């Protein structure tokens, strides 16, 4: 895991992503000297992996917004810029996008990234542009749209349809780092 933290002065500003469900442990992680090169810490509240979800981490926090807020508040105390990545909900019957976005902003997140699918869809299915747009309309902080970006055209469509401030490319970059 330590090898994943490698960075050098030519990279400019870099962020580290963490996940968990214990506010104090996550704050300690933010304050750990190994994260010193990273002025930004992103908290992953969107991971759909069953093991992570069963531990009450990742996308499970969508079902426990009070704990998610506590995590953000605690991590902000570290002095790092705290951002949050999350999904639009657990499933179609439990969409939480706008409310969760507001709660993360109120807890002190400086930016949010919204993956436009529910946890149960993992990486398949249509990206719900309207849900990402609802997050953008609900908060004053920057909103990054995520999900289904495999080309410049996909990124343009995601920006145009959601009004987001930016786009995050994920899996596609593994196959085409120049995307």
Regions found by a protein language model. Name each.
Residues 1-179:
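Flavin-dependent oxidoreductase catalytic cores
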């Amino acid at each position: 895991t330590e090898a994943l933290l490698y960075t050098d002065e030519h990279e400019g500003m870099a962020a580290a992503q963490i996940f968990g469900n214990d506010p104090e442990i996550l704050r300690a992680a933010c304050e750990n000297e190994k994260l010193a090169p990273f002025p930004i810490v992103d908290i992953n509240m969107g991971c759909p992996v069953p093991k992570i979800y069963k531990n009450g981490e990742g996308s499970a926090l969508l079902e426990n917004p009070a704990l998610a807020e506590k995590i953000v508040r605690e991590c902000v105390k570290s002095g790092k810029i705290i951002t949050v990545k999350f999904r639009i909900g657990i499933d179609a019957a439990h969409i939480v996008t706008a409310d969760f976005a507001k709660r993360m902003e109120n807890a002190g997140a400086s930016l949010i990234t919204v993956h436009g699918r529910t946890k149960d869809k993992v990486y398949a299915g249509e990206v719900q542009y309207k849900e990402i747009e609802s997050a953008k309309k609900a908060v004053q902080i920057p909103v990054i749209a995520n999900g289904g970006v495999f080309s410049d055209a996909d990124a343009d469509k995601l920006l145009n349809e959601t009004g987001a401030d930016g786009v995050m490319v994920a899996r596609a970059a593994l196959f085409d780092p120049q995307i």
